[in-house]
Every structure is written in structure tokens, then in C-alpha cells.
Amino acid sequence: MFGEGVGGDAAFTVEVESGVLGVIVDVLGHGEEANKLAVRMQEYLLRQTSGDVVGLLSRLHEGFRSSRGAAVGLCMIELASGRMRYAGVGNTVIRRFGDSETRLVSRDGVVGGTMRTPVEETLQLSDGDMVVLYTDGVKTHFVAAEYPWLRTHSPCVVATNIVHRFGKPHDDASCLVMRYKR
């Protein structure tokens, strides 16, 4: 983002009891204060061991009630079964790219502010599916045809390319990509 040295986005994974938890955070606002809150939320979530996405969002909301708040998306992938569970609040996006494309919906609200009860959505992943989480700093409606190597590049390369190709110049932009392998 132009004019800011740091931002309020965070994207990371956490190993939990039965798989991997993918996390995307977009703190309201920009700059140093937004960055500090994003780091605190990341530190909190890195200490968690549960893959219960609804419970984690609810606890995060309670723990950061007095903050400026954030949009947060949590994606739990059970490694043995390929079952994916997602819950999100605010302007976070999760998409699955595989034989077909699927987009799951985050609920309106702000973690730490006004938030309705999160809702969990589930998907069954197939071998090689790419799960892509991103913040509202990335153009929402890009299609796989705009990035034909989406399923063949490494997740790190895909995330970097999505931010560079589809990121908005005047907003923080973060992307997390995970490939499911049986």
C-alpha cells in the first residue's frame, strides 16, 4: 500500500489437533496501530490447538472487544479426510480452485466490534485442490482463467502473484494459499 511502511493484515497457518488452520486477518485502518493489533491477534491464534473455527472466532471476538476490530477468516483442513471447515467475519474471502471453483461466504461484522454468531461452512477437498484466502485488498472477482497456472505453481508463488496481479494499490492486501495433498 502506498504511504505506509506496515499494514494491518496477517496471513498464516497453525498446526492444530487434526490438521492445519489457515488464518487471514484484516484489521480496520492502516499503519502502525493496525499492525500492532494484527500481531496481537496472530500471537493469540498461534497459541491455539483447536480446529473449531466457530469457537475460535467467538473467543477471538471476546478477547479483542476493546480493540479497533478486524475482519477474520479461519479455514481448518483435516489432513486425513480432506474435510475443510470455514468461518469468517467481515471482508475476507475464501475460494477453492480444483475441478470446480467454490466461494464460501463470510458473515457481516467486525471481530472485536459488532459480530453476529459465526456460521461454519464445510467442503470436501480433492487431491491437488488449492484453497485461497485473501483480504479485501485483493480484487474479489478474479477468475482462474486470469491466472492459468493457479493449480500448478507452488502455494507461495500463487499467493505472491495474486497480490501482485489483483491487489488494490491503496489498501493492505494479503493472501494465503494452501494446496491439499492426500
Task: Please report, for each region that a protein language model flagged, where it lies by residue.
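Conserved subregion of the PPM/PP2C metallophosphatase catalytic domain
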Residues: 1-34, 38-182
